[in-house]
Amino acid sequence: MFGKVEEKLNNVLKTEGALYFILIDPDEKNCLEIAEKVKDYADAIILGGSIGITNLDETTKQIKEIIGDIPIILFPGNVDGLTPYADAVFFMSFMNSNNTYWTTTAPTLGAITVKKYNLEPISMAYLGIEPIKRTAVGFVGEVNEIPQRKPEIAGMYCLSAKYFGMRWAYLEAGSGAELPVSNEIIGISKKLSGINIIVGGGIRTPETAYQKVLSGADAIVTGTLIEDNPDAVKEMRNAIKKAGIDKL
């Protein structure tokens, strides 16, 4: 049984072949400005960060007023990254963290708040891919990063996630990563698991996004892109949607 947000995302996948998620850090001073710029291009807004969260309730309400019916999915960096004003939450395990806090304890502590806030949980495996160790999420999450040259390891993690009952896997190279997740990792992860594959980190050009979708990605995440080139979001969406149709 899917919730409303996940059902909506799956319906877009069936008709358009790929999703475009835009990550907004609620602690960024210009987060409302970013929301205004991207509202016409995102299939969902992913809201969260890997360091501190301040004034999340008010920021989420303000972003919701700007983006209208576009779902806000929380991407919590810790148990304080939850708010009742979002539509859903990626209920995730950082599967290749060396610290059990991130694999099981944090989601366990957050579960009762997810229920209290009536947030739709979207079960997801979160996997740190090389070079994530050199990014904030890799440092905070104490990640045992998956080497780019060993795509079968990522594939096995995704298959494990499927057997645990997770429906999504996020292959993350880290915000601002110098290299994105390889096409080989994406391809084998999708082929082995069959679950929805999200790819983020280091995707800076429409051409790169196009190749990631053709390789098997179901959703592409960009975040810092809008800060570097505000006009790139439309081009990115067009490339993702073209690849999605070409893949169908």
Curated annotation (Swiss-Prot):
Q: In which pathway does it act?
A: Membrane lipid metabolism; glycerophospholipid metabolism
Q: Which residues bind sn-glycerol 1-phosphate?
A: 170-176, 201-202, 223-224
Per UniProt, the keywords (alphabetical) are:
Cytoplasm, Lipid biosynthesis, Lipid metabolism, Magnesium, Metal-binding, Phospholipid biosynthesis, Phospholipid metabolism, Transferase
* Keyword hit for Metal-binding: yes
The UniProt GO MF terms for this protein read: imidazoleglycerol-phosphate synthase activity; magnesium ion binding; phosphoglycerol geranylgeranyltransferase activity
- The residues that hold Mg(2+) are 25, 50
Q: Where in the cell is it found?
A: Cytoplasm
Recorded hits in CDD domains, A to Z, give: PcrB_like
> What Enzyme Commission number(s) does the record list for this chain?
2.5.1.41
| Reactions that this protein is recorded to catalyse | sn-glycerol 1-phosphate + (2E,6E,10E)-geranylgeranyl diphosphate = sn-3-O-(geranylgeranyl)glycerol 1-phosphate + diphosphate
Q: InterPro entries this protein is in?
A: GGGP/HepGP_synthase_sf, GGGP_HepGP_synthase, GGGP_synth, IGPS_HisA/HisF
Example GO biological process term?
glycerophospholipid biosynthetic process
Q: Which cofactors, if any, are listed as required?
A: Mg(2+)
Cellular component, GO, one term: cytoplasm
Q: Does the keyword DNA damage apply?
A: no
Q: What does this protein do?
A: Prenyltransferase that catalyzes the transfer of the geranylgeranyl moiety of geranylgeranyl diphosphate (GGPP) to the C3 hydroxyl of sn-glycerol-1-phosphate (G1P). This reaction is the first ether-bond-formation step in the biosynthesis of archaeal membrane lipids.
The entry sums up its family as follows:
Belongs to the GGGP/HepGP synthase family. Group II subfamily.
Cross-referenced NCBIfam families: GGGP, GGGP-family, PRK04169.1-2, PRK04169.1-5
The protein's name: Geranylgeranylglyceryl phosphate synthase
The top of its lineage is: Archaea, Methanobacteriati, Methanobacteriota, Methanomada group, Methanococci
